[in-house]
Amino acid sequence: MAKISRLPDTVANKISAGEVVQRPASVVKELLENAIDAGASRITVMIKDAGKELIRIIDNGTGMNREDALLCVERFATSKISVVDDLDTLMSLGFRGEALASISSVSHFELKTRQAFSPLALKFRYEGGALAEESEVSGEEGTSISVRNLFYNVPARRKFLKSNATEFRHIFESVRSLSLAYADIEWRMYNDDEELFHFRNPDIRERLNYYYGSDFSEGLISITEENDYLSIHGFIGKPGMLKRHKADQLFYINRRIIQNRMLSQALQQAYGELLEDRQAPFAMLFLGIDPSRVDVNVHPAKLEVKFEDERSVRNMFYPVVKRAVQLHDFSPDASFVPDQGVQGESIQPEDEALNRRLMYHERPGRMATTAELYTDYRQHSLPQSSGKEHGPQSRQGEFFSAHEPLERWKKEGVEPEGDEVFTTMLQSRFHDDESAAGGGTEPKIWQLHNKYIICQIKNGMMIIDQHVAHERVLYERALDVMNQNVPNSQQLLFPQKIEMRQWEYEVFEEIRDDLYRLGFNLRDFGSKTVMIEGIPQDVRSGTEVTILQDMIAGYQENASKLKLEKRDNLAKSYSCRNAIMAGQKLSLEEMRSLIDNLFATRVPYSCPHGRPVIIKLMLDQLDRMFGRT
């Protein structure tokens, strides 16, 4: 007698359901995709007990005749494909013909459907995958599917479901991702008989504001890019918009929601140092690609895809997002928010004033570009033009040598590329802009406690942390110098000797080539001793020994804790140790030079470690604080 036997369909469907139907949200996703594929222009979602008691999806799509209605609950019965080659032209969301068979096998399943020309709807009821009832009833055009008592006959699976709050969150995220992708569809959702939303208008921003909070969409950057291989459109958000996690990164391929590590990493890298540790920026990005160039049949829930040429996709996706990030003003606004105090204690007005604290929040309103913020500063902080013309890279002070990439490229024959092309374009917008709008003859720039630089802008003030601003300037300059391999060193009149401990000398040996590229001219003097004979232009004479020692220590610390790339690590260590410090008094010329050099950088809004460089305090905020509104 044979030991191997063919499993009955009811058993096979239950096993298959383990892959396709992992939780109530899986059912919702599959049923919604079927409704969309059926051409629905109106979809209603009804949930009870987090999907354990009831999941009902109602659509006004094309409906089905009796033959199709019976076949749709059979395994591997589908109208989407008939031969393997059909996968190369597939644009529908569903195609395998597994979902309804799996769902009906682990629930009390009811399907009601009517085509436009039929006087009555067809109703089919299944118990554990077996047809229990068939009848004709009255009903609207389209299809209604009800899934009751999910996993009633698989108690082990039902036992492992999470709390209602967790399961409903997953359901809500499934509905959210599809309602955002298909804004042309009218969506309505109920939870335990309470209406959550009813989206009548195809306004994607209205939906974003509902899902993420009032005015959320006002802080988004729109992206649109297209070539013969790939199209990209959608939105990305400011760093720190809410406390985001990667569930708020929505990637779509041909309007199919997917999870893709490469796209997520490229997005993260495009934001770079603008993000703090464990931050993930918001994104809702739609990629359009020839379906023959992407395989959607690699995951049971169709959440993952495989690109024919992943490198080409990344090589287009990354610079598009990075360019959008660099073009916009990411400086946070400051708001003064009173502490709530201890419950049960009254706070007197004077105590309330003393207990105000400076907080960061994302200010709603149209996103400003870097160019606009810099132009605003020049118009309202600087006096009327006196004939001298300055760009953001042209001023010099005691601590800030000029950053002149255009002249450097001309002299050295270096072709600008990547970020430098963008920087050049940005600088061309700043140049020759000495507006008289600011009025007066005195620059409206001040230093506060030898720590912060305050500048007047059109509708308020801009506050700059002088240390991290200079750190950003030095960081980008150090990376540029090392990557171009054109050392710029100034020789010391009196070389300095530095004796190193064993670990310091080992680190020095590891980074000595890049130290040379950076501008340090160093010579071995024997017995772990090094002579400093030349230093970078940005290093002040007399500080070279301390800076080199601090750089080596900082490099070692970063290598062990952050595991940074070698040159990035060195540039961070160099800029942090060499930047002007809080408490250092600056002249007006030095402050202007620092601001000009800051706005010549690629990312002026955060230091290399992710801290903010610029904060804006707007007049309307001050007016509210003084009771003027």
Curated annotation (Swiss-Prot):
CDD domains given in the database record: HATPase_MutL-MLH-PMS-like, MutL_Trans
- Highest taxon of the source? Bacteria
Single Gene Ontology BP annotation: mismatch repair
Which Gene Ontology cellular-component terms appear in the entry? mismatch repair complex
Keywords attached to this Swiss-Prot or TrEMBL record, sorted alphabetically, are:
DNA damage, DNA repair
* A Pfam entry, by short name: HATPase_c_3
Entry-linked Gene3D superfamilies = 3.30.230.10, Histidine kinase-like ATPase, C-terminal domain (3.30.565.10), MutL, C-terminal domain, dimerisation subdomain (3.30.1540.20), MutL, C-terminal domain, regulatory subdomain (3.30.1370.100)
Please name the SUPFAM superfamilies in this protein's record. Answer: ATPase domain of HSP90 chaperone/DNA topoisomerase II/histidine kinase, DNA mismatch repair protein MutL, Ribosomal protein S5 domain 2-like
Q: Does the keyword DNA repair apply?
A: yes
Which residues pair up as cystines? none
GO MF term list = ATP binding; ATP hydrolysis activity; ATP-dependent DNA damage sensor activity; mismatched DNA binding
Report the sequence similarity comment from the record. Belongs to the DNA mismatch repair MutL/HexB family.
Q: What does this protein do?
A: This protein is involved in the repair of mismatches in DNA. It is required for dam-dependent methyl-directed DNA mismatch repair. May act as a 'molecular matchmaker', a protein that promotes the formation of a stable complex between two or more DNA-binding proteins in an ATP-dependent manner without itself being part of a final effector complex.
Name under which the protein is recorded: DNA mismatch repair protein MutL
